[in-house]
Amino acid sequence: MTASAPVITVDGPSGAGKGTLCKALAESLDWRLLDSGAIYRVLALAALHHQVDISTEEALVPLAAHLDVRFVSQNGQLKVILEGEDVSNEIRTETVGNTASQAAAFPRVREALLRRQRAFREPPGLIADGRDMGTVVFPDAPVKIFLDASSQERAHRRMLQLQEKGFNVNFERLLSEIQERDSRDRNRAIAPLVPATDALVLDSTSMSIEQVIEQALAYAQRILALPLKK
């Protein structure tokens, strides 16, 4: 890890637009990208590939510590590369999700993945997408953004996404699920979902994604005097 490499952290609840913003920032600045939300799924998939016993913390820790993963944004699409292979779709399966939940229960695995995430900090810089990037993982990041939106707006966005994929969805159920997750995330004892005290808080409820990207880029450039990728 190169502590002097700048980091832009983007935290916030699901559906606020963090992923889209982070991909745009990474492409505009030509920086590395970290999708912390995918880390446990990548670890789970690696464990399945290498037939590591997911019920044993001792077996998972070395795998977590040396996880060979990269996140690449190309034309607005995020690719998750595990050991040189594109696993963007594979990490989204139910089996991988269940395995990830088991792995996340181990304290030493969480600590190993925390160190692994910090190792992404390399020149020219890092865009870190998550929920506690600015408060826990990179508390010294020079640029911190907390991207929020109303629960109603986030439920509406999620409904449109699912409908585009051909799913019939109930708005009230989606809204209830989002509000329940918000409550858990904001009130948990360890690493609650809150803005860092020095974060720029952007409410995207009534903003287009283009406006969000423009404001975030302007803020980062003002603090870091960054050139845009040509």
Curated annotation (Swiss-Prot):
NCBIfam families: cmk. Its main location: cytoplasm. Keywords: ATP-binding, Cytoplasm, Kinase, Nucleotide-binding, Transferase. GO terms for biological process: nucleobase-containing small molecule interconversion; pyrimidine nucleotide metabolic process. It is found in: Cytoplasm. One of its GO terms (molecular function) is CMP kinase activity. The keyword Signal does not apply. It catalyses: CMP + ATP = CDP + ADP; dCMP + ATP = dCDP + ADP. This is Cytidylate kinase. One of its GO terms (cellular component) is cytosol. ATP binds at residues 12-20. Belongs to the cytidylate kinase family. Type 1 subfamily. InterPro entries: Cytidylate_kin, Cytidylate_kinase_dom, P-loop_NTPase. Its EC number is 2.7.4.25.
